[in-house]
From Swiss-Prot:
Record flagged with keyword Magnesium: yes
Gene: engB
Binding-site list for Mg(2+): 38, 59
Classification via SUPFAM superfamilies: P-loop containing nucleoside triphosphate hydrolases
Function: Necessary for normal cell division and for the maintenance of normal septation.
Binding annotation for GTP: 31-38, 57-61, 84-87, 154-157, 182-184
Family named by the database record: Belongs to the TRAFAC class TrmE-Era-EngA-EngB-Septin-like GTPase superfamily. EngB GTPase family.
Cofactor list: Mg(2+)
Protein name per the record: Probable GTP-binding protein EngB
Annotated signal sequence range: none
Any one GO BP annotation for this protein: division septum assembly
Length: 208
């Protein structure tokens, strides 16, 4: 069983020089505004670290968290950073600010060698949004051989059982979800433990 032994906030940045040194492997969490990034990060880490804004799209900072994972069964202990990116698809900002902000984010994702895993959160109720398709294409265009891209579906518990099953059959594998009610789901769906194992496996495949 994987246990998160430590998770704490490092810093926020809006420019590259403000980012912490690239000393350990990192996973990036991205998704459109109001997709549930804060909820996913807090569930994953077992701690209320990520804060959501009352106004979707208002936050324009990349937030860095340091985490230590322990897998006792395999005598493994490893430290990774989690980077929480601002939600994309916001509307209430000026064009100049939007351009500046997007420039920082894409530069961060392009040049930071410590990023090993991109986790793209997608609302399970809205699978075919153009904004998510564009984000996926842009991230995959950036991918280096030592990086991986995974989709993870949020708000899975908002679907009825037929919708859950249909998504499970048709979605790319590994099938990963986030919900506040993992224990209430059918046993065929991934648990929080499986989500953690999958992410850890990808982070360890190409260590920094």
């Amino acid at each position: 069983m994987i246990v998160i032994k430590d998770a704490h906030f490092l810093t926020s940045s809006s420019q590259l020089f403000q980012c912490p040194a690239s000393l350990t492997s990192e996973m990036v969490v991205l998704g459109r505004s109001n997709v549930g990034k804060s909820s996913f990060i807090n569930t994953l880490l077992g701690k209320n670290l990520a804060k959501s804004s009352a106004t979707p799209g208002k936050t324009r900072l990349a937030n860095f968290f340091s985490t230590t994972w322990e897998d006792k069964e395999n005598a493994l202990r490893a430290t990774f950073n989690v980077i929480d990116l601002p939600g994309f698809g916001y509307a209430k900002v000026s064009k100049s600010l939007k351009k500046e902000w997007e420039g920082f984010l894409w530069e961060l994702l392009s040049v930071r060698v410590s990023i090993k895993l991109f986790i793209h959160l997608v609302d399970a109720r809205h699978l075919d949004l153009e904004i998510d398709k564009n984000a996926k294409e842009n991230i995959q265009a950036l991918l280096r051989p030592d990086q991986a891209y995974l989709s993870l579906f949020t708000k899975f518990d908002k679907l009825n059982k037929n919708e859950q099953h249909r998504l499970f059959l048709n979605a790319p594998k590994p099938f990963l979800i986030n919900t506040a009610h993992f224990n209430a789901l059918s046993s065929k769906y991934p648990t929080l433990e499986i989500v953690r194992q999958t992410l850890l496996k990808h982070l360890l495949t190409n260590p920094l």
